[in-house]
Every structure is written in structure tokens, then in C-alpha cells.
Amino acid sequence: ERYHRDLFYSANIYFDLRRLYANYNNCLNEKLDLELLHNIRPPLSIAEEIKINKTAKVHIIGVCIETRPDALDDEWLWRFRRWGVTRVQLGAQHVDNKILKKINRGHTIEQLLWAMKYLKDNCFKIDIHIMPDLPGATPEIDKAMFDYVYSVVCPDQMKVYPCEVVPWTIIEKWYKKGTYIPYFEKNNEDLIDVVRYSMTTCPNWVRL
């Protein structure tokens, strides 16, 4: 909570801070004197800082936070409201339960749909992360995934980032054993076609 409060606090005193330094660029290269900073005024409660920010010169128009579809509950939602969060990012990765289980994602498509409704019912904007070319996926499966996302999941924004083999992961072990070969490596045009499909079929109201 202190982190979020200080986001609004720093925006609210931004121009007061600039006046403390004859050359603002020096401020960026010096160790900030917290005592001097608090002489401007000490930070208030997060609710007070958010209220002040509504009319501040440096106005924070949105705060985005990332979580999992299976990690939401009333307590977390209350915290999001208190922290001034306006947009929530959900790591969905895929909409096929078989693929989600294979990669040990730990949640299901049903939990994603519940989280989407839960957040929208409480007036949050929602981003989701989608990952084509996961183990078990094919170009056809991934195209169907985007159809499902646009027609059923209905996010406000979506980030698409193809699966990447990274060190110290089970996917790397599968890759080295040859049990997982990204379809991009078999034919890179397949992945390009899938990403192109995600763009050309994307509704106007989804930010991609």
C-alpha cells in the first residue's frame, strides 16, 4: 500500500520538488534527501493522496496491476480499490484446459471466465495475456483460441506474446528432449499467420 501511496505522493509534489533544485537534471543524478523531500510536506494517507491527485498538475489517469485469474477474491478487490487501481492484467496464457494443465498453469478457463465477470461487475478494465505456440498447441488450435477470446472472454485489452523457451524450465527440458518443438521452428510462417490472424480478427473495441 505504501508503494501505491508514494506513486500518487510523488506525482502530487512533482513541481514542488523541481523548485528545490536549480538544475532539475542534477536531481536525477543525486541521492535524494528524504528529509528535504518531507520538508515539502510529508506523505498523507493513500486516500488523501488520491484525492489531491484528482486536481494535481501531474495527474495519474490509471493504475494497472497484474495478477492471476485464480488469485482474486473480495479482499484483493477491496485492496485494488483502496490503491486506486483502475485496470487489472490477467495472465490467461491459453483457453484450452488441456494445454493449461500440460504447462502446469494452475488455473482453468472456467476460472478465467469467472475472474473476467467478477472484475467487470466491479467496473475494472481488464487486460489478458495470451501465449500462442505453447506445448500441445497447433496453429489451428491457436486461431480457435483467438476466436474464443474475442467472442466469449471479451477483454478490453490483450497482449500476445508467443511461447519462448527459457532456461531452468520444464518447457526447456521438453525442448531438449524433443518432446516439444514449437511450430514456429517447423514453419515460421505458421506463427506469423497466427499472429496476423489475431490482428485481423480483433474487434475494434479490443486494444491489441
Enumerate the predicted regions with their spans.
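Conserved non-cysteine loop/helix-boundary elements of the Radical SAM core domain that shape
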Residues: 1-193
